[in-house]
Amino acid sequence: MSDIALTVSVLALVAVVGLWIGNIKVRGVGFGIGGVLFGGIIVGHFVDQAGVTLSGDMLHFIQEFGLILFVYTIGIQVGPGFFASLRVSGLRLNLFAILIVIMGGLVTAILHKIFAIPLPVVLGIFSGAVTNTPALGAGQQILRDLGTPVDLVDQMGMSYAMAYPFGICGILLTMWLMRLIFRVNVEAEAQKHESSLANGHSLIQTMNIRVENPNLNNMAIQDVPILNSDKIICSRLKRDDTLMVPSPGTIIQAGDLLHLVGQSTDLHNAQLVIGKEVDTSLSTRGTDLRVERVVVTNEKVLGKRIRDLHFKERYDVVISRLNRAGVELVASSDASLQFGDILNLVGRPASIDAVANVVGNAQQKLQQVQMLPVFIGIGLGVLLGSIPLFVPGFPVALKLGLAGGPLIMALILGRIGSIGKLYWFMPPSANLALRELGIVLFLAVVGLKSGGDFVDTLTQGEGLSWIGYGIFITAIPLITVGLLARIFAKMNYLTLCGMLAGSMTDPPALAFANNLHATSGAAALSYATVYPLVMFLRIITPQLLAVIFWGMG
């Protein structure tokens, strides 16, 4: 059997064994995709015992390409929500998550100095303790750039594997501990979360208002400042028994009912100016109007602003809402359309059909993958990661590397959405498939390289010490921030659990948090809020630690 065939066969065996291990669950919690690492260690141990030699160059390529695929698809997935998560609505959650990342780095630095832990080993322990595989890849990349011998770099994978199991368990124990300390009633916490959503300022809501301000009588909608802003959309107007779609030039009269869409604060301000909130229904049922959701798939409208498409003037149709990457937004006139945007349209059936044809609304396109943008993005990411940054006092130029470069480029491209006919939208199923393939390849190689010496290190070497260091790196930041968030910020318990899981980019922990309450989406919402920024920081942190430790000697 050729070297290539043998290497591929062994990797396939690792994937099978590892994924099987990952599917084993105890009380609903398992290693998930992380099981591939342990599959690699098991197979690697027996491969080493049998004296089988695999192609080193091929393994190195597969490891790096798998890492590139993984971080790139993560960037494309979270890109649309990354910058939004930095805004005020998620600022508090992100600050606590950032604190967890910083504390983890500080604990790692203290352990490194006190116990003189070798740099590759301590970076591996850090990556395993926070259950973040891209951090492992980023750390190995920067160590190679700093000229660290290959055999020492491979130790990072072994120490990662030592710290990983408690990284998984530690987050779950922290959630349990918070529940025990504060005597949390999960059902009550879920109800509080739902109440806060109802009063939240970040959610898009609707309000029906009767025009009672005499100063607004016989004024055009465009002449009323609160209605002519990008913060509120007036999608329906009811006069007597007639329901219509208003235009900027529509004259409003006293007694008219307006259906407004916007954020809670803006709707309240509009109500103070216009009149009184009413419970009267402005449903399109039984009228010649209808409400329909259509998806943007036509390349010709990508990047165009809503105001430039003149849907109201041409078709008498109003866009009341815009859903982008699962986030409901006010469809302001300045908003630019991106591939995959979902538009909430109000108008007559024939007019809505006409607008649907303009924006595309081709559901099958959402399942197609444009491969050209994928490789353009990967290529640009690798180039970005290869740009040297010369810092005085360091022996080599610093780089973002094959983990940081593709991630940052994917975040940018995911946020941009499209350039001309090229769009970086990727169907969730395709994104997941490429992401899983990438991480399986990466972890399989890391496990194979670590497997030969793993058992000896655990039983006769410093393996138990490494596990102990990992416990400190996992537990101290999580417990400290958990207590701070609950005591001083009065954070909802379910929201706290989601934030803790997101700060560790840990899907098994999210699954555990979601199972705390069957119907509440609090944990998933906070997880998604902090995940993009934390993933970026987790990849950058080991590189910063490596550079700082290297500079300190």
From Swiss-Prot:
<protein>
    <recommendedName>
        <fullName>Putative transport protein YidE</fullName>
    </recommendedName>
</protein>
<dbReference type="Pfam" id="PF06826">
    <property type="entry name" value="Asp-Al_Ex"/>
</dbReference>
<feature type="transmembrane region" description="Helical">
    <location>
        <begin position="4"/>
        <end position="24"/>
    </location>
</feature>
<feature type="transmembrane region" description="Helical">
    <location>
        <begin position="437"/>
        <end position="457"/>
    </location>
</feature>
<feature type="transmembrane region" description="Helical">
    <location>
        <begin position="28"/>
        <end position="48"/>
    </location>
</feature>
<keyword id="KW-0677">Repeat</keyword>
<keyword id="KW-0472">Membrane</keyword>
<dbReference type="Pfam" id="PF02080">
    <property type="entry name" value="TrkA_C"/>
</dbReference>
<dbReference type="InterPro" id="IPR050144">
    <property type="entry name" value="AAE_transporter"/>
</dbReference>
<dbReference type="GO" id="GO:0008324">
    <property type="term" value="F:monoatomic cation transmembrane transporter activity"/>
</dbReference>
<keyword id="KW-0812">Transmembrane</keyword>
<dbReference type="InterPro" id="IPR036721">
    <property type="entry name" value="RCK_C_sf"/>
</dbReference>
<dbReference type="InterPro" id="IPR006512">
    <property type="entry name" value="YidE_YbjL"/>
</dbReference>
<feature type="transmembrane region" description="Helical">
    <location>
        <begin position="393"/>
        <end position="413"/>
    </location>
</feature>
<feature type="transmembrane region" description="Helical">
    <location>
        <begin position="95"/>
        <end position="115"/>
    </location>
</feature>
<feature type="transmembrane region" description="Helical">
    <location>
        <begin position="533"/>
        <end position="553"/>
    </location>
</feature>
<feature type="transmembrane region" description="Helical">
    <location>
        <begin position="65"/>
        <end position="85"/>
    </location>
</feature>
<dbReference type="InterPro" id="IPR023018">
    <property type="entry name" value="Transpt_YidE_put"/>
</dbReference>
<dbReference type="InterPro" id="IPR006037">
    <property type="entry name" value="RCK_C"/>
</dbReference>
<dbReference type="GO" id="GO:0006813">
    <property type="term" value="P:potassium ion transport"/>
</dbReference>
<feature type="transmembrane region" description="Helical">
    <location>
        <begin position="371"/>
        <end position="391"/>
    </location>
</feature>
<feature type="domain" description="RCK C-terminal 1">
    <location>
        <begin position="192"/>
        <end position="276"/>
    </location>
</feature>
<feature type="transmembrane region" description="Helical">
    <location>
        <begin position="158"/>
        <end position="178"/>
    </location>
</feature>
<feature type="domain" description="RCK C-terminal 2">
    <location>
        <begin position="279"/>
        <end position="361"/>
    </location>
</feature>
<keyword id="KW-1133">Transmembrane helix</keyword>
<feature type="transmembrane region" description="Helical">
    <location>
        <begin position="464"/>
        <end position="484"/>
    </location>
</feature>
<keyword id="KW-0813">Transport</keyword>
<keyword id="KW-1003">Cell membrane</keyword>
<feature type="transmembrane region" description="Helical">
    <location>
        <begin position="493"/>
        <end position="513"/>
    </location>
</feature>
<comment type="similarity">
    <text>Belongs to the AAE transporter (TC 2.A.81) family. YidE subfamily.</text>
</comment>
<dbReference type="GO" id="GO:0005886">
    <property type="term" value="C:plasma membrane"/>
</dbReference>
